[in-house]
Amino acid sequence: DGECIFGQHSAAQTHLEGQGVGLGDVFVFFGLFAEEETGEPHHRIFGYLRVEEMIPLAGGAPADLVALRHPHALAMHSANDVIWRGEGRTAKRAGESLRLTVPGGPPSLWKRPEWLKRGGLSYHDREDRWLHGKRLRSVARGQEFVADIGRRQAPREWLARVIDEIKAS
């Protein structure tokens, strides 16, 4: 229906708070997939959420989220359990532009947009992660990587293309 409801808690939520993630920001979700023809594992972007509302659950979950049976609304996972809510969708098909893993590479070896440089993605500060040829060796664990794009035009255009691809699928 065009709405995304995402729950987060514990260290991951603390990281998001520490990075200043909030209203108006956009989550870009990725996961591990397998190519249909070859079974090749790879990371791929599969959805997004434009944050319109942040709902701390420490004071109780809103009735509409309980009625939807959202896992974070049914039972608190930790003291800092939060629901992130807003416009969002998942991709219906796997367009090549949403693939993160370089062709033929291990899942953790990503192609990266030109605008994304060392120091621009949380958890990826080590120099050896930023490789020639616009590649990034992604950390093996984690899911909340924050890129503060500010008002820069190139990352905003990249994000718009990703969202357009998801909506068009």
Regions found by a protein language model. Give the residues of each.
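Short N-terminal edge-element motif at the start of the domain
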Residues: 1-42
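Generic detector of bulky aromatic hydrophobic side chains
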Residues: 13, 33, 48, 110-113
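Short beta-strand-centered aromatic/proline hotspots
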Residues: 38-55
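Contiguous surface segments at macromolecular interaction interfaces
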Residues: 54-169
